[in-house]
Amino acid sequence: MTDAAQRISELRNELDAHNYRYYVLDEPSVPDAEYDRLFRELQALEAEHPELVTPESPTQRVGGEALSAFGEVRHEVPMLSLGNAFEEDDLRAFDRSVQSGLGLAGGDLFGGGAEVEYSCEPKLDGLAVSLRYENGQLVRGATRGDGSTGEDISANVRTIRNVPLKLQGEGWPQVLEVRGEVFMPKAGFEELNARQAEAGGKTFANPRNAAAGSLRQLDPKITASRPLEFCCYGVGQVSGELPGTQVAMLQQLKAWGIPISRELKLAKGVEACLDYYRDIGQRRMSLAYDIDGVVFKVNNIEDQQQLGFRARTPHWAIAHKFPAQEELTELLDVEFQVGRTGAVTPVARLKPVKVAGVMVANATLHNMDEVARLGVMIGDTVIIRRAGDVIPQVMAVVPERRPADARPVHIPEQCPVCGSAVERTQLIKRSKGKASVSEGSVYRCVGRLSCQAQLKQAIIHFVSRRAMDIEGLGDKTIEQLVDEKLIGSPADLYKLTYEQIIGLEGFAEVSSNKLLAAIENSKRPSLARFIYALGIPDVGEETAKVLARSLASLERVRQALPEVLTYLPDIGLEVAHEIHSFFEDAHNQQVISALLGECGLELQDEGELSAEFSAVATLGGMLDKLNIPTVGPGAAQKLAERFGSLEGVLNGDWLDMRQALPERQAKAVREFFDETANAQRARAIEQQLREFGMHWESEKKVAEGLPLAGQTWVLTGTLEVMSRDVAKEKLESLGAKVAGSVSAKTHCVVAGPGAGSKLAKASELGVKVLDEAQFLEQLKSYGIEA
């Protein structure tokens, strides 16, 4: 090694050590002037010896060449969002849910229960990112995006001063993906805005907007000039072992040079969590950065894995949000807007006022029921809040300030956009047993797609990135297409011609051809994307994925009865009715038929019903779903055990019915099925369960030929080649049942690194144990690759 190379290596190591002490330990070891001197010396040496410059050198944070666009990054482990708690009772309910999920006493409302350990840290108000290290070197940075796919911001994250370009120490996993928040400290935000104002540039409303805008610059040199910082809160994909608790894992990351929260604490029990929340809340304004709450996570990693996930949120973590900031202002007027589903909703026009750093002139009033509840009138002084520090809403009226000329708010009789009638629909909650309960009302424009507001919103949703992903069809272009009457439904997009497009404002030959190509390229969507694009009320992206993954064909989704849909994860009866009603609508049927017929769309991943839902129904469960008055799950199961079939229940005599149930319930069952419509409905549900392969009598057929049928397996510890969710799916596809605890009936336990009590229990009971390599070999023997 030459003298220059030796000195460069020494300087890099010394500067990395100073950065670690400054940003991670908060213990500066040298004055800023000394750091700057060392940095300039390194710059000079690298300028003299450019062949010695490496990507991880501290001098390379200044940013490289500008990009034309961000690349796409698929997250191997999805970056999920957190559920929210807004009140102390919400957090206590979360704690009870955790205890129940872990099988601890106290999972009910009144039990004491064991105290669960939680990690506690502030919820930074910034942008979630992923940093991937391979062999200790930073190789990629990505935004959260939609949780499954983000943007490649590697060049930009390398410019953030406290992000280590290479890890400290030793023993890190070969692949280590850390997740955290990029944010802008308050002081840096004020300095940036002062510089922007002095230069005549755009100032930012708040530190979060400044951080997001700075991180997503195509020119990394701009990002390098912004005072951004990173704080790690967890990990994603890891090939190797990490400590078995959240706090110990974060402390290990800190030892490797990854910055973590200085406010990280361990709390035992929910009351200690609430103490932490109150303490941070009191110190919130004095912190060097903006926060909007506190995050609590079950500390034990194996417990986290046992608790699992909902569609988009973990069962083992929650964000306890702070109350939103509020201000007083005047309600100048109420206007009405029309949404994608025709809902006519009131919007408050306000005298502009600054709330949480943002100038607010409009706020949501939600619906006319909320207007009535508030008793709000035009001219009132109102309290507005930025809910979640994002969406402004009217919270209350100050009645003593009401002027004499205040005017009541009236819903228009005609749609403000198309002039069609506005009709009031009562929202009914179909409660279990029995009596339907009103949940307020909604006013809708009956114009449907003849209403330009509804049509525009429907098309905007249809072409959006997470739906059909037709690039080049922005909101303004869609407005032109609708205003010029070139499209009247989503199907008309596929009939557009070059001559029609080039006549639009902002389009020339190249852009017109690009748009036509984008429309053509969208003709082979996944089933989930297509379902989401249809804009079914209450069906978001995750519910669309559930429908596609579970039923695996559009025809099954279209035919599915509401009660059958409720067998799918996270689909309740209300959403099921929305789905069923949407596909029963004649106009919707016409649009779908046009898309799949003359427009030439081909859905790519249709197939057989997911094995997870084969024979998922039981007779007792189906009877319970019929909502027979006074008959709950227990009584429904007694009926199933007594009669053995639906026809047996329908035709059973009074004596048999009374032997199964008390007189009051037996009478309710008899009266329910005496109504022909109810009996027909029950038979229709059972018939569809048979057709879909979900009927309880399908179980024997499903089990035939499946090598693990009748076996119960348990997964524990960390699996490196595949996630535990994937392993569970593969086992279930072979006929196995995957349980959360070990018993004498357990056939086999798959144990990865970090396996704890379940592995010990398996050894105690003499249950067969496989490590991951052996498990993969067994899967391979059945023709299933990892």
Curated annotation (Swiss-Prot):
Among Pfam families, the record links this protein to:
BRCT, DNA_ligase_aden, DNA_ligase_OB, HHH_2, Nlig-Ia
- CDD domains linked: BRCT_DNA_ligase_like, LIGANc
Q: Where is the BRCT domain?
A: 703-786
Write down the chemical reaction(s) this protein catalyses.
NAD(+) + (deoxyribonucleotide)n-3'-hydroxyl + 5'-phospho-(deoxyribonucleotide)m = (deoxyribonucleotide)n+m + AMP + beta-nicotinamide D-nucleotide
Does the keyword Metal-binding belong to this entry? Answer: yes
Q: Where does NAD(+) bind?
A: 32-36, 81-82, 121, 144, 181, 297, 321
**Its EC number(s):** 6.5.1.2
Cofactor or coenzyme needed: Mg(2+); Mn(2+)
Q: Which GO terms describe its biological process?
A: DNA repair; DNA replication
What GO cellular component is one of the record's annotations? cytosol
> Binding residues for Zn(2+), per the UniProt record?
415, 418, 445, 451
Where do the catalytic residues lie?
123 (n6-amp-lysine intermediate)
Q: Which GO terms describe its molecular function?
A: DNA binding; DNA ligase (NAD+) activity; metal ion binding
Asked if the record carries the keyword Ligase, the reply is yes
Identify the HAMAP family for this entry.
DNA_ligase_A
Q: What does this protein do?
A: DNA ligase that catalyzes the formation of phosphodiester linkages between 5'-phosphoryl and 3'-hydroxyl groups in double-stranded DNA using NAD as a coenzyme and as the energy source for the reaction. It is essential for DNA replication and repair of damaged DNA.
Name-wise, this protein is DNA ligase
| UniProt gene name | ligA
